[in-house]
């Protein structure tokens, strides 16, 4: 299977992953993140990362 690795845990957990998921679920934040990066987009919508 080509996607067998998707279920594997990341070797180094990303402490920002929960915030990244919040931003991805907000279409406006997700779109802005594509242009200016996740951390800056999150900050604009939700405050400091």
UniProtKB/Swiss-Prot annotation:
Disulfide bonds join 23-29. Belongs to the osteocalcin/matrix Gla protein family. It is found in: Secreted. Ca(2+) 2 binds at residues 21, 24. GO terms for cellular component: cytoplasm; extracellular region. Keywords: Biomineralization, Calcium, Disulfide bond, Gamma-carboxyglutamic acid, Hormone, Hydroxylation, Metal-binding, Secreted. Coiled coil: none annotated. Residues 1-47 form the Gla domain. Ca(2+) 3 binds at residues 24, 30. The lineage of its organism: Eukaryota, Metazoa, Chordata, Craniata, Vertebrata. This is Osteocalcin. Its main location: secreted. The keyword Metal-binding applies. It comes from Equus caballus. GO terms for molecular function: calcium ion binding; hormone activity; structural constituent of bone. The modification 4-carboxyglutamate is found at residues 17, 21, 24. The carboxylated form is one of the main organic components of the bone matrix, which constitutes 1-2% of the total bone protein. It acts as a negative regulator of bone formation and is required to limit bone formation without impairing bone resorption or mineralization. The carboxylated form binds strongly to apatite and calcium. The uncarboxylated form acts as a hormone secreted by osteoblasts, which regulates different cellular processes, such as energy metabolism, male fertility and brain development. Regulates of energy metabolism by acting as a hormone favoring pancreatic beta-cell proliferation, insulin secretion and sensitivity and energy expenditure.
């Amino acid at each position: 299977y080509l996607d067998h690795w998707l279920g594997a845990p990341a070797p180094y957990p990303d402490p920002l992953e929960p915030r990244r998921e919040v931003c991805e679920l907000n279409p406006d934040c997700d779109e802005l993140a594509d242009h200016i990066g996740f951390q800056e987009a999150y900050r604009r919508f939700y405050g400091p990362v």
